[in-house]
């Protein structure tokens, strides 16, 4: 009688544990990859944006060192660029082409890899000076090349004059 009662009690506990295991999803099923968490942040940026077009991930900086806890905020840095897709279409940004001369934003903050908690703290700022810096670099490079050519010609003339007076 005692063994039947113990067996019945053990059976109930086994059933409860089985039900609990089925109801609570595993932690690995809830964890996102670093890239997935960043893509979720880009989606959130598009949801909260009042701009006409969607943004798409352009560049993702290296992920931080591995951390076993998906709920721990991870530092993140990435760049997004404006696409040709209008926001109201809600097309997945990955399917949209980048807009020529579209806006580029540098985003920094923290994400978690936990799908349930999902706290994001991301700030994005438009990179306005990229075109200006590029033009300035090209201008200085061109001027430097021209200056170098002039100095070379002056040096050659000095050498020619030196040879002329020595002969």
Swiss-Prot record:
Family recorded in the similarity comment: Belongs to the cathelicidin family.
Stated name of the protein: Antibacterial peptide PMAP-37
First and last residue of the signal peptide: 1-29
Signal among keywords: yes
Domain of life: Eukaryota
Gene Ontology annotations for the cellular component aspect, listed alphabetically: extracellular space
Keywords, alphabetical: Antibiotic, Antimicrobial, Disulfide bond, Secreted, Signal
Origin species: Sus scrofa (Pig)
Cell location: Secreted
Pfam families the UniProt entry points to: Cathelicidins (PF00666)
PROSITE patterns xref list: CATHELICIDINS_1, CATHELICIDINS_2
One of the record's GO molecular function terms: lipopolysaccharide binding
Main location: secreted
Propeptide residue range(s): 30-130
Gene Ontology terms: biological process: antimicrobial humoral immune response mediated by antimicrobial peptide; defense response to Gram-negative bacterium; defense response to Gram-positive bacterium; innate immune response
Species lineage: Eukaryota, Metazoa, Chordata, Craniata, Vertebrata
Disulfide bridges in this chain: 85-96, 107-124
Its job: Exerts antimicrobial activity against both Gram-positive and negative bacteria with minimal inhibitory concentrations ranging over 1-4 micro molar. Its activity appears to be mediated by its ability to damage bacterial membranes.
